[in-house]
Amino acid sequence: LKTIIDVKLPVRIIGDENGYDFFSYLVGEITTSDNEIWFDFSECNWFDGNLCAILGNILDTLKQRNNIFFFKGFQSTPYNTFSRNKFLSVFTDEPIAELDSLTIPYQKFKLEDEQKAKDFIKEQLFDKPGMPKMSFEAKKAILVSIFEVCVNAITHGQCDHVYCCGQFFPNKKTPEVSISFVDLGRTIKANVNDHLGSHLTGNKTILWALDEGNTTKTGNEPGGLGLKLLQNLINYNNGSLQIVSADGFVELKKHVFIEHAMKNYFPGTIITIKLLLGDSNSYILSTDVDTENIF
C-alpha cells in the first residue's frame, strides 16, 4: 500500500529565496519510494514558467523511485502556464497545447544531445522577438556559453539529463525572459570542495566556480570562459544570473554578486538566466574566442 502525501504549493512560486527554498524542501520531503503524492495547487495563483524545469526533474526522480503523483486544484494562471509550455502534456494526459511564442517549452537533454540543445536554445531564446541584438559571432559565442553552463551542470553533476524551461514576460514593468537549467546530481559544493580539498560553504564554492579561469574540469577542455562571456552579457544587458546548489544561492545583478541564505539544501544545481527584452545595445565579440566546432 502506498503512503499518501499531500503537497500544498505556496501562493506564488517565483525565482527568489522562498521559491528555491520551497523546491529544496520538496526534494527533501518527497523523494522517497512507493508513495502516492498529490500536488495541491488550490492556493497557488502564480508559478514562474521557467521553474517547471525544477518541478519536472523532481517528478522524474519520483517516477524512478516507484511513486505515483497527481495534480489537483489548478487555478487558471498556473494551469495556462503549465499547458502552454508543454509541461502538462509530458506528465498528464492533457493534449499538447499549441506552441506559444512566449514560452520556451519544457525540455530535457542528454549529454550527447549537444546539437539538439544548441538548436533549441537558439530557436526558442535568441531567435524570438525582443531579444538583444547580436552579431552572428557573438550569438554563436553566447550559445556556447549557455551550453557550457548546461553541460557543466551535467558533467559535474554526473546525472543523466539537464532540464530546461523558460518564459517570456513582455508585460512586466521591465520586460524580460527567464530560462532555467536544472540537474539533480552532485552539487557545485561537493565538486569544488573535492577539487580543492576544502570545506567551503555553498555560496563560497559557487563564487569560486564563477571566477574566471577556475574549473574543476580535468583534461584539455576549457573551463570558465563561457561563464565570463555570459556574465558580460548579463551585466551589459542589466539582466541577472542565479545559481542555486547545496546550501548556496548566489545572484549576479548589476555587476555585483549577492549571496543569499538558503534554509534548505538543494541536492543538485539550478541555474536561471534573466535577460531584459528590448535592450537597445548591440553585441559584438571583441576577442577572438575559438568558436569552431560550435554548430
How would you describe each model-predicted region?
Residues L1-T31, T92, A97-E98, L196-L200, ...:
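Flexible, glycine-/charge-rich segments associated with ATP-binding catalytic modules
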Residues K8-F91:
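Amphipathic alpha-helical interaction surfaces in cytosolic regulatory modules
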Residues E36, T174-S178, G268:
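A generic structural signal for beta-strand entry/edge sites
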Residues N50, E137-V144, E148, E176, ...:
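Short, well-structured alpha-helical interface segments that form or flank functional binding sites
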Residues I58, M134-P170, K228-I234:
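Conserved ATP-binding N-box helix of the HATPase_c
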Residues N80-E112:
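P-loop NTPase nucleotide-binding core
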Residues I104-M134, K189, L196-N214, L230-N232:
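Helix-loop-beta hinge of the Bergerat
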Residues N152-N193, V256:
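ATP-lid-like helix-loop hinge signature
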